[in-house]
Amino acid sequence: MAKVIQLSDELSNKIAAGEVVERPASVVKELVENAIDANSTVIEIDIEEAGLSSIRVLDNGEGMETDDCKRAFRRHATSKIKDENDLFRVRTLGFRGEALPSIASVSHLEIKTSIGEGAGTHLILQGGNIISEQKSSSRKGTEIIVTNLFFNTPARLKYMKTVHTELGNITDVVNRIALAHPEVSIRLRHQGKNLLQTNGNGDVRHVLAAIYGTAVAKKMIPLHISSLDFEVKGYIALPEITRASRNYMSSVINGRYIKNFPLVKAVHEGYHTLLPIGRHPITFIEITMDPILVDVNVHPSKLEVRLSKETELHELIRDGIKEVFQKQRLIPSAQLPKKSAPAPAKNEQQFMTFEESAPERKLPEKTPEPSYSPMKLSSVVKEPEPVIIEEEILPNEADHGVPPELGMPETAAPVSDTPEPEAVSEEIREERVPMMYPIGQMHGTYILAQNENGLYIIDQHAAQERIKYEYFREKVGQVEPEVQDMIVPLTFHYAANEALIIDQHQHELESVGVFLEAFGTNSYIVRCHPAWFPKGEEAELIEEIIQQVLDAKQIDIKKLREEAAIMMSCKGSIKANRHLRNDEIKALLDDLRRTTDPFTCPHGRPIIIHHSTYEMEKMFKRVM
């Protein structure tokens, strides 16, 4: 008796459904992507009980003729590719011909479709089998209703999460598709309640506002960079806007939402030292590339892709984000969010505006500078507007600011393919931090300073940490550092297994200034160290660098140097409760203005907080 048998189409579809239709969100994703491939401009999605009861997707796309509609429910039947060559130049969201038969095999499915000429087609399927065929209206487009999902696969139904969790997954999928296709009007409703409505005007900022709220959308700045093989556009949130999850970072390649950890890593590297540990930015990155450079035929869900020239793309995104932030003034406002009643839900997102009305600003009259200030204003700082502004924008730097309605052109100018050796000149660096006049200290920890724009509070430890970090980062990278001999050498003792690791990574340790000599069994002696090591903390610093090597699963010299620079800057910086003289404060602020990233310490904490004059007057009821 033969042991190898041919599985039936019904069983094959159920097996395929295990990968394609993982949960209700998978059904929504496949149906909406099919609607987009059909050139729909309006898509309506109605969900009942998080999709477990009913999923309805209605579009105004091209529709299908009767024969095509029947054929679409056969395995690997598709209109999107015709031969093997098409597989390597996929420009549509779907192409495998698995989604519809897989969905139909584990549900009750009803479809009405028409090409707009004559009567349409109305099919009813159960478990993948057509049980009814009728004529339908001639309205151009397609309507698909999926009910009783997983009715014949109880094991899959048993592992469904709560209604709240499944609805969250559906919302997440639709949000990302809406971001990838702002030219399509998408409405998502759950049990009659609107969860998302986009207007399909092609402006991704309006979609960002619909998903994250207008306040967050106004804090997102445009990104536009390109190279020979890639064009990258999108919006990235200012570093003050963070989340605890990476789920707010969206990547799209050729109109397809994807999950790709190297791209997420590239974005994080672009934000390097600007985000607190454990926090993540809100970003939307849209990549356009030749389809031959991306393989989307990796997994039936089509979320995972393989990229050619991934390293080049990684560097392009990382450097592009860094360059955008190097032209920004990133001083957050100290104002607290105001509690207010939630706004009534709107059925449409039409006519959304980013504008904030404000009186015309004029340059303030030049006032005499205090005699004690050694710093000069490199540019006149404008008077603040009497509106809620959480981030100051550089004058004449609108290209890298907020959406156009807030005073910037439609798109930011693309970043040059060839980065300059020094991205930010000394003049631009000093302009990014406004001129501030010290007026005192608070608790020996915070410096208070002022100018015509209001009050600035500076964390003195974080400020010096940033200054020293940039100094040590340069020093640690030196090939032959200036070495200083120690009068009393330092000795270190380790367990046998640790000594083996240390011996293996002597070269890496020397690259960060730790010069070890064998000194007996599992012991080492240090007779010299780079001259720039923080005085009095050499032993502790060397121990911590060695510990990093012992703890690391894989040694990355670049990362090791980075961690060493951060460690030295933290240890050598001013501590809390240290009262500074006026000249020390002024020197500290002067040095801070010359740093590359003067707004956060190496750990991502803010250095400067701003209280605008207007907000101060408002708090004291001098203005209403």
Swiss-Prot record:
Keywords, comma-separated and alphabetical: DNA damage, DNA repair
Cysteines paired by S-S bonds: none
Taxonomic superkingdom: Bacteria
Statement: the UniProt record of this protein carries the keyword DNA repair: yes
GO terms of biological process kind: mismatch repair
Membership in a protein family: Belongs to the DNA mismatch repair MutL/HexB family.
Listed PANTHER family: DNA MISMATCH REPAIR PROTEIN MLH, PMS, MUTL, DNA MISMATCH REPAIR PROTEIN MLH1
Functional description taken from the UniProt entry: This protein is involved in the repair of mismatches in DNA. It is required for dam-dependent methyl-directed DNA mismatch repair. May act as a 'molecular matchmaker', a protein that promotes the formation of a stable complex between two or more DNA-binding proteins in an ATP-dependent manner without itself being part of a final effector complex.
Protein's UniProt name: DNA mismatch repair protein MutL
Species this protein is from: Bacillus velezensis (strain DSM 23117 / BGSC 10A6 / LMG 26770 / FZB42) (Bacillus amyloliquefaciens subsp. plantarum)
